[in-house]
């Protein structure tokens, strides 16, 4: 028997729920009366998931309704009764909480990400000097808000790793880092603009720790910004969890299956994500 990793087992379980790859059929293009598949997804998935959904709609005729936001806030909305059928989170904790409460499938990791530092043109940092840069008293560090946005949780996990590299680093970073995004009351950029590029362009921070995919988008919008890779000893892997409601309709399970299939995974890779 072929040995399977826990991630592979999770993916196999999701495919089994969908009826397996050879048995579940995508909705026919003629079925225009089928209700849209309601998807709640982490904001960092926006570009890639928009592309995947657009292609899926063109191939199948099935409409996909996408709502983006910080994963923790989306999970709270689902707990309060909002009716999305599929949840793509930037972590596995929030979908697991839904599954533990009942009514949702156990999450499966479908893509991965990592953290990068988005820096202003005034900051001269490299991977080797990044920690010293973050600890400088004259450098303002920005982050998303922990618990509301997994990016913030991953950032604080990076700070814990930093403490093993330089004693006392966690306390200093914990006290100085500005929680500028990801909360319900965080400032909102104009529509269609990266919140991280916008915050940096507004001068709210000198360094912003965010997903590498987010940092690349922000740097394209604000070219004077720089993207600095986090060194291996500080890097925190971000595993994105996918879950859908138990008893989901064939249209929902078919789209969930499509997210795991090679064409969609190729799109995610093109946008900077890595394989599960």
Predicted features along the sequence, with ranges:
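Bacterial N-terminal signal peptides that target proteins for export
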Residues: 1-10
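Central helical "cap/lid" subdomain
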Residues: 102-108
